[in-house]
Amino acid sequence: IAKMEMICEKLQLERGMKVLEIGCGWGALARWMSQRYGVSVTGITVSKEQAKLARSRCAGLPVSIELADYRALNGEYDRIVSVGMLEHVGQKNYRTYFAKARSLLKDQGLFLLHTIGAGRGGFATDRWIEKYIFPNGVLPPADALAKTAGEFFTIEDWHNFGADYDPTLMAWYENFNRSWVDLKTSYSDRFKRMFDYYLLVSAGSFRSRENHLWQLVLSADGIAGGYRPSRWSASAQ
């Protein structure tokens, strides 16, 4: 809830706005934005399972969940948000991604991009995580992200709160192990070892500051008078 509320504050949502969510997942953010802020939301995903559940969660709200590729979209939106999707775009497609987002955003609109980022070593791909958790996932380094985003947008704000991801992942690890007594009839011990390893290695990568968690707020041509960012820690709520 804290993460969703921080996103909404940074987007400076107003009732009646049209919002596009690129990579809407299971529909939680789309529902939150619509219920709390009175905006209409178009959410897109390439997963049939996600689309089905998201539509169920958002039933009765001005939310449209579409099974679509972002490259095929048309229209114009006051706000765009994309959470945890850039990691799956691929570095060769960054220009296409940002160019399409710019074409969909109104001139005075805002685009919030939420992504895990790599440290100083350049684009990061872990072979084990790619095989078992996130196929074809790539983490962008800051310089590549700034260069490509900056071709199409003004970077109004760049928030790094990766240190907060460490306690989040540890909480997931504890919840997973606490629930294992109910889950073990459906999953193997091998799966448990795999997921334990994933959660702990990921927590370590953020604790060591090897990986980062970024939220960028982008505008089309710069906000007149400047953008006033929301600054609070999601882990503190």
Regions found by a protein language model. Give the residues of each.
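A short glycine-rich, Lys/Arg-flanked "PGG" loop and its adjoining helix->strand segment in the class I
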Residues: 95-107
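Conserved class I S-adenosyl-L-methionine
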Residues: 16-23
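A short acidic, Gly/Pro-enriched loop at the edge of an enzyme's catalytic core
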Residues: 71-80
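Conserved SAM-binding loop
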Residues: 54-55
